[in-house]
């Protein structure tokens, strides 16, 4: 059931059920929106502001009603559109303090670079995060958007971009809120429970979002599934789980050996086999939907990820009525309503 949008453009919106939409998932950008009857939260803004708004509209979501952005960690594929989106909408951004500081260190020098220098740094960042860089995508657009904070055109009259100074501080946000892993907090009527995950970032976290009796767990960008994270994910109605790579494809693939080692390390990414091991041995079977996410376009195939998960669940899949879905890089996933 789709949400009923209010006639006024700002903030409030009536939603009949809790709704989750993965807008983008993969090495080139990640973003998910979770909505309750009173609150709408964006988890990560890993695509440009223009692309983010476009995908939200395609999914039937209204960007004007976003209440906050949560950040899992500071890697580019999770923060590309963060500053522009937050400023356009005038909404707070929630980080751990270490992630915020790492983000500021990374974004501030980049604004003072030429496009060539910025692109070289972006390629280096992409290699570090095992993200294939597509020169035909929106590199120039992303650079110009960050340099000028240009207006985002959605439809005439829908969103009026606020005037910004051409040389606005790239690290300036409308409001910054800090949280700590292990300590729950609330955004509107959504309770957010962050937990530490093993990844090569300053202070990476996963989230469990709970509202109206529904629990949504988000666990991507982790080298392995630690016991405390597994415990946090118990009782979730929706589980977004990383299934990044097929080990054989990664070993035989195009990445430099140093990047392959990083991806396979305990601070890298969860493989299909590792995700399947979690589902077989630690998953409690409570989720109506299991969303396999952050699939590598270079080192994985959707069907390989699906087959590994289905085999792990075995006969319990039909018994528990689990439904396995695949989040994609290029388009929003069909929304889940509960």
Where are these regions (language model features)?
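Conserved beta-strand hairpin/beta-sheet module of binuclear metal-dependent hydrolase folds
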Residues: 11-59, 205-220, 238
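Metallo-beta-lactamase
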Residues: 98-205, 211-212
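Cap/insert and terminal regions of metallo-dependent hydrolase folds
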Residues: 227-327
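Short, basic/aromatic-enriched C-terminal tail that caps enzymatic domains
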Residues: 322-338
